């Protein structure tokens, strides 16, 4: 599946299908990006005993109907209010159930359903306004609304938020995804402009997010020690010239070894990288669905 090729070949394509394609492509591209420190990639399963690349790919594909339905619901409803928030919440829970059926109970993309689901809905609400900041701001307005049907959470992320006093995925969304919009995307663009290949530019974007994110996945697995190792190590790679430089590559290998030793996997940063890739592509492809509006 390649959303950009699909849009180029079929001008006037259905908006919901295009946005779902983009979201799934972003998840698969994030999973396949290598070498990511302590994360599932083409080399192996990172710090995860229960995950592998094929499972991540299958999980991403299973979420296509969820993203399509979220986009369709937002386009039909046409405004941000409690009713839309409730519909999106239920669609997200349905998508999570489909994911868990596909993975036989393994949580591969729960955080990504939240982040990308909000961004897909936000893009569908105003499909001619596709700049990253605009889409993230609309997503933040949706996230600020409570979903009365949502269960009171006792997930790893919720427990980490309470224990360490960090914001987590919910606050990141309510603040309009600042680590993606203000850190990940600018680094992606800087690395491209500096001559880095696309894979290295994406790695640098991931590292920029890791350098500033209070990643609840890392905190859950390795506490404050793990978080400091992630943030300091990511900054060291970028300061050494990024993943495209020899010195940066050496630092990246050191970071990978350190996080693996701590069993610390930056899953929250990975979700935000997928959000970056989705937002990065929106302006370039939005003309493909103009004829369907």
UniProtKB/Swiss-Prot annotation:
HAMAP family: MdcB. Involved in the formation of 2-(5''-phosphoribosyl)-3'-dephosphocoenzyme-A, the prosthetic group of the acyl-carrier protein of the malonate decarboxylase. This is Probable 2-(5''-triphosphoribosyl)-3'-dephosphocoenzyme-A synthase. Its EC number is 2.4.2.52. It comes from the Bacteria. InterPro entries: CitG (IPR002736), TriPribosyl-deP-CoA_syn (IPR017555). Keywords: ATP-binding, Nucleotide-binding, Transferase. Belongs to the CitG/MdcB family. Pfam families: CitG. It is an enzyme of class 2 (transferase). It catalyses: 3'-dephospho-CoA + ATP = 2'-(5''-triphospho-alpha-D-ribosyl)-3'-dephospho-CoA + adenine. GO terms for biological process: prosthetic group biosynthetic process. The gene is mdcB. PANTHER family: 2-(5''-TRIPHOSPHORIBOSYL)-3'-DEPHOSPHOCOENZYME-A SYNTHASE, TRIPHOSPHORIBOSYL-DEPHOSPHO-COA SYNTHASE. GO terms for molecular function: ATP binding; triphosphoribosyl-dephospho-CoA synthase activity. It comes from Pseudomonas aeruginosa (strain ATCC 15692 / DSM 22644 / CIP 104116 / JCM 14847 / LMG 12228 / 1C / PRS 101 / PAO1).
